[in-house]
C-alpha cells in the first residue's frame, strides 16, 4: 500500500490533479488530463523518486497508475 501512496503522491505533484481522482486504474492522459510532455516529466519524477531508470520503450507502456506500480515493483 505504501508504494501506491508514493506513486499517487508523485502523480498528484507532477500532474497537479486532485488526489481523489488518482486511482490505480487511472489513465494519465485520458483520466487525469496529462499530455505527452506531462507523461515524460512524470516518468522522470518516478525515476528520481524510486532510483530506477525507465527506458523509453518501457515508459511508453506505462499508461496508468497500476502500470507504474507494476513496473517499479519489478524493476526497483
Swiss-Prot record:
One of its GO terms (molecular function) is acyl binding. Residues 1-76 form the Carrier domain. InterPro entries: ACP (IPR003231), ACP-like_sf (IPR036736), PP-bd_ACP (IPR009081), Ppantetheine_attach_site (IPR006162). It holds the Pfam family PP-binding. Its main location: cytoplasm. The modification O-(pantetheine 4'-phosphoryl)serine is found at residue 36. GO terms for biological process: lipid A biosynthetic process. It comes from the Bacteria. Keywords: Cytoplasm, Fatty acid biosynthesis, Fatty acid metabolism, Lipid biosynthesis, Lipid metabolism, Phosphopantetheine, Phosphoprotein. One of its GO terms (cellular component) is membrane. It is found in: Cytoplasm. 4'-phosphopantetheine is transferred from CoA to a specific serine of apo-ACP by AcpS. This modification is essential for activity because fatty acids are bound in thioester linkage to the sulfhydryl of the prosthetic group. Pathway: Lipid metabolism; fatty acid biosynthesis. SUPFAM superfamilies: ACP-like. HAMAP family: Acyl_carrier. Carrier of the growing fatty acid chain in fatty acid biosynthesis. Belongs to the acyl carrier protein (ACP) family. This is Acyl carrier protein. The gene is acpP.
